[in-house]
From Swiss-Prot:
InterPro entries: Integrase-like_N, TACO1_YebC-like_2nd/3rd_dom, TACO1_YebC_N, Transcrip_reg_TACO1-like, Transcrip_reg_TACO1-like_dom3, YebC-like
PANTHER family, per the entry: TRANSCRIPTIONAL REGULATORY PROTEIN YEBC-RELATED, TRANSLATIONAL ACTIVATOR OF CYTOCHROME C OXIDASE 1
Organism per entry: Rhodopseudomonas palustris (strain TIE-1)
Subcellular location: Cytoplasm
Domain of life (superkingdom): Bacteria
GO biological process: regulation of DNA-templated transcription
Pfam (any one): Transcrip_reg
Name of the protein this chain belongs to: Probable transcriptional regulatory protein Rpal_1287
Keywords, comma-separated and alphabetical: Cytoplasm, DNA-binding, Transcription, Transcription regulation
Gene Ontology molecular function: DNA binding
């Protein structure tokens, strides 16, 4: 369970650390527009768009902003963004995956490479670390939506792979192939999830000391602060004391 908790806390630092709401909303809007462009502008029929809208709602992004981002795609937004995945190693040899949406591939690559180098790590080729992660669906519900037993029973019946329940809520994991069906089944029973997305989940995590952990968090913060970066994933664990310190 500790691994699940660490993974969740590390991945969620982005929201807590990003004090610049306008920058966060800009990133969320970019993902909504791209998702709507690539598929239908109806979230009910477009899983990626639905995930983007849920993420925006979770950050209290105004409804008007969400609708405007979707209309941008419908109206043939002139901005074109490339989806790029960067992979590399951070301090302590920790594997890191960076997902970006950029209108300037050269700038993004140069900036991200610089972040890795300054941290003492190095940016690798595509595929250099992704084999250590699984492409996994995650669905989250608030703790008061159901008891741990009820959520577990419903998730297993729907075809989920794993469920982790705590005071913070319920995390349901499903394969990329079954994710959409599991999400639909749970929504029919418990209502709309607070999050439903496909992520890179580490197969195993590496425990690092506090000094290395601080360097890794600094790298992740620098990456997350970049306008083009949408998501950052890594396969490390830190002490509870450091997690509390960095979250404070």
């Amino acid at each position: 369970m500790a691994g699940h908790s660490q993974f969740k806390n590390i991945m969620h630092r982005k929201g807590r650390q990003d004090a610049q709401r306008s920058k966060l909303f800009s990133k969320l809007a970019r993902e909504i527009t791209v998702a709507a462009k690539l598929g239908t502008p109806d979230p009910a029929m477009n899983p990626r768009l639905r995930a983007a809208v849920l993420a925006a709602r979770a950050e209290n992004m105004p409804k008007d902003n969400i609708e405007r981002a979707i209309k941008k795609a419908i109206g043939g937004d002139s901005e074109n963004y490339d989806e790029i995945r960067y992979e590399g190693y951070g301090p302590g040899g920790v594997a890191v995956i960076v997902e970006a949406l950029t209108d300037n591939r050269n700038r993004a690559a140069s900036d991200i490479r610089s972040f890795f180098t300054k941290s003492g790590g190095n940016l690798g080729e595509t595929g250099s670390v992704s084999f250590m992660f699984d492409r996994t669906g995650i669905i989250e519900y608030d703790a008061d939506k159901a008891s741990a037993d009820d959520m577990l029973d419903a998730a297993i019946e729907a075809g989920a792979d794993d469920v982790v329940s705590s005071e913070a809520g319920h995390e349901i994991y499903a394969s990329q192939e079954t994710f959409r069906d599991v999400a639909k089944a749970l929504e029919a029973k418990f209502g709309e999830a607070r999050k439903a997305a496909v992520i890179w989940k580490p197969q195993n995590t590496v425990a690092v000391d506090d000094e290395t952990g601080e360097k890794l968090f600094k790298l992740m913060d620098a990456l997350n602060d970049h306008d083009d970066v949408q998501n950052v994933y890594a396969n490390f664990e830190v002490s509870d004391a450091l997690m509390a310190k960095m979250a404070g």
